[in-house]
């Protein structure tokens, strides 16, 4: 009877499938994403929204030095979750691809074309020895021909388009919020509030200075970073909404108990 190769053998090599058809190193890369900061992306009727909780762990860190949202082109922006160094490499590649498209074809690259190019790079790192997968997920969003696009890429190179989605450690909770609250007809302003509401459910305290947020509106088609002052106003509105929901829940519970 042929002896099975120990699991550790499949564990060490990126190019070898386990008997169950799994690539363990890709799964470990996904685990790096699951431990990363939470990012939320939302398509709205008049644009797109990205928001990330930067999860600052020390008072000594200069918050302005921690970037989680990156402008790729005038009309494309990306949010990252996972290994920071891997993010830097892929963001640089994405920017180069966008520049090359303008030089070669005289026009801006589409959001979908850019997302596919990044996924091709990720996928290649799951097939060749001497390298490891990127421990990184990306939300790539922008405006294409008057319509918003939002793509999620994972370490395997898989690409999925969403109306609203989340990546990182708070994904399960954030997705529950998005599935229950998302409306295709919401405006960018409403999308910003929903994004921060989703993030508030994934952390004990949502601090405005720790939030990185960007929007792109159909009207201007340009990436716009949101200031801390504006984020603070939205966070305040979010917590007022949360407080009202908690009071309503307590009231309903009291009525049920009295019955």
Curated annotation (Swiss-Prot):
Subunit structure: The 20S proteasome core is composed of 14 alpha and 14 beta subunits that assemble into four stacked heptameric rings, resulting in a barrel-shaped structure. The two inner rings, each composed of seven catalytic beta subunits, are sandwiched by two outer rings, each composed of seven alpha subunits. The catalytic chamber with the active sites is on the inside of the barrel. Has a gated structure, the ends of the cylinder being occluded by the N-termini of the alpha-subunits. Is capped at one or both ends by the proteasome regulatory ATPase, PAN.
CDD domains according to UniProt: proteasome_alpha_archeal (cd03756)
UniProt GO molecular function: threonine-type endopeptidase activity
Known role: Component of the proteasome core, a large protease complex with broad specificity involved in protein degradation.
Similarity remark: Belongs to the peptidase T1A family.
Subcellular location: Cytoplasm
InterPro entries registered for this protein in UniProt: Ntn_hydrolases_N, Proteasome_alpha, Proteasome_alpha-type, Proteasome_asu_arc, Proteasome_asu_N, Proteasome_sua/b
An annotated GO BP: proteasomal protein catabolic process
Keyword list, A-Z: Cytoplasm, Proteasome
Lineage top rank: taxon: Archaea
Name this protein carries in UniProt: Proteasome subunit alpha
A GO CC term attached to the entry: cytoplasm
Organism annotation: Methanococcus maripaludis (strain DSM 14266 / JCM 13030 / NBRC 101832 / S2 / LL)
Regulation affecting activity: The formation of the proteasomal ATPase PAN-20S proteasome complex, via the docking of the C-termini of PAN into the intersubunit pockets in the alpha-rings, triggers opening of the gate for substrate entry. Interconversion between the open-gate and close-gate conformations leads to a dynamic regulation of the 20S proteasome proteolysis activity.
């Amino acid at each position: 009877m042929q002896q099975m190769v120990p699991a550790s053998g499949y564990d060490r090599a990126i190019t070898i499938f386990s008997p169950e058809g799994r690539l363990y190193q890709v799964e470990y890369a996904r685990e790096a994403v699951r431990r990363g900061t939470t990012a939320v992306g939302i398509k709205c009727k008049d644009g797109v929204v990205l928001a990330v909780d930067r999860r600052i762990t020390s008072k000594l860190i200069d918050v302005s030095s921690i970037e989680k949202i990156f402008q790729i082109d005038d009309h494309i922006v990306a949010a990252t979750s996972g290994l920071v160094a891997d993010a830097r490499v892929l963001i640089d590649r994405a920017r180069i691809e966008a520049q090359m498209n303008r030089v070669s074809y005289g026009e801006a690259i589409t959001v979908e074309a850019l997302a596919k190019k990044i996924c091709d790079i990720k996928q290649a790192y799951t097939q060749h020895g001497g390298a490891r997968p990127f421990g990184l997920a990306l939300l790539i969003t922008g405006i294409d021909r008057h319509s918003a696009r939002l793509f999620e890429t994972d370490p395997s190179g898989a690409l999925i388009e969403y109306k609203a989605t989340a990546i990182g450690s708070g994904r399960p909770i954030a997705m529950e919020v998005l599935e229950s609250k998302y409306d295709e007809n919401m405006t960018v302003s409403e999308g910003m509030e929903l994004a921060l509401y989703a993030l508030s459910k994934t952390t004990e305290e949502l601090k405005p200075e720790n939030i990185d947020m960007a929007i792109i509106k159909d009207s201007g088609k340009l990436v716009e970073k949101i200031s801390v002052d504006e984020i603070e106003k939205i966070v305040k509105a979010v917590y007022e909404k949360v407080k009202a929901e908690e009071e309503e829940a307590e009231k309903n519970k009291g009525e049920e108990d009295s019955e």
